[in-house]
């Protein structure tokens, strides 16, 4: 295994990492900056994903020393489907898939198409940022509708999400960590309240199902 070093925050690498990836695409490397092995070959990655021995959680990794001020974030993250192994992951996945009935899936096509047309029709005449105006709006609105959350909440959902994923960025700072913790607490509190509302007044959405 070759030793490899490349700062993930180096501006030139951030803007265009592909020449570096091309050089290390064959075989495994030990990425010193991350202190872990890494692999970039499609064929090797494909083999790993098909290997039943590969899991999300590290085996016998011991207890992780989480700072007390970050504990609220990790208390929530610990229950994320992205962090779980079977059988908990399998159980949650079945629950989610059960909510996606053939009728609901069939209704999504025209619904998303109408949403896209609506957003496009509202494009301003002056120059604008298509990412914030369109590209981020489509998925967050669709997710809100699936959950049964009011569309007026989409900007709040997006802020919570953006703040929380900052925990996985290379340029993580104490300020970003504090924002992630605050947003995780706010999001969890909102969802707990909203789930209780849906329990008392079910609707045709993912939370009710």
Describe the residue ranges of each PLM region.
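Active-site substrate-recognition loop segments, prototypically the cytochrome P450 B′-helix/B-C loop
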Residues: 1-131, 140-158, 162-172, 177-182, ...
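Conserved cytochrome P450 catalytic core segment spanning the I/J/K helices
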Residues: 133, 184-209
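Active-site/ligand-binding neighborhood in enzyme catalytic cores
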Residues: 136
């Amino acid at each position: 295994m070759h030793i490899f070093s490349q700062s993930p925050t180096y501006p030139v690498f951030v803007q265009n990492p592909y020449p570096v990836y091309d050089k290390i695409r064959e075989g495994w490397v030990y990425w010193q900056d991350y202190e872990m092995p890494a692999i970039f070959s499609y064929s090797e990655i494909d083999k790993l994903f098909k290997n039943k021995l590969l899991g999300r959680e590290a085996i016998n990794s011991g207890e992780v020393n989480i700072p007390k001020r970050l504990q609220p974030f990790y208390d929530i993250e610990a229950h994320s489907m992205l962090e779980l192994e079977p059988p908990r992951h399998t159980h949650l996945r079945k629950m989610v898939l059960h909510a996606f009935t053939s009728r609901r899936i069939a209704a999504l096509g025209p619904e998303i198409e109408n949403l896209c047309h609506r957003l496009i029709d509202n494009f301003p005449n002056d120059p604008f940022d298509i990412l914030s105006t369109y590209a981020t709006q489509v998925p967050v609105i669709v997710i809100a509708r699936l959950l049964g959350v009011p569309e007026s909440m989409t900007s709040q959902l997006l802020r919570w999400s953006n703040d929380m994923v900052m925990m996985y960025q290379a340029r993580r700072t104490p300020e970003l960590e504090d924002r992630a913790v605050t947003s995780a607490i706010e999001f969890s509190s909102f969802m707990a309240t909203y789930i209780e509302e849906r329990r008392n007044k079910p609707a045709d959405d993912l939370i009710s199902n």
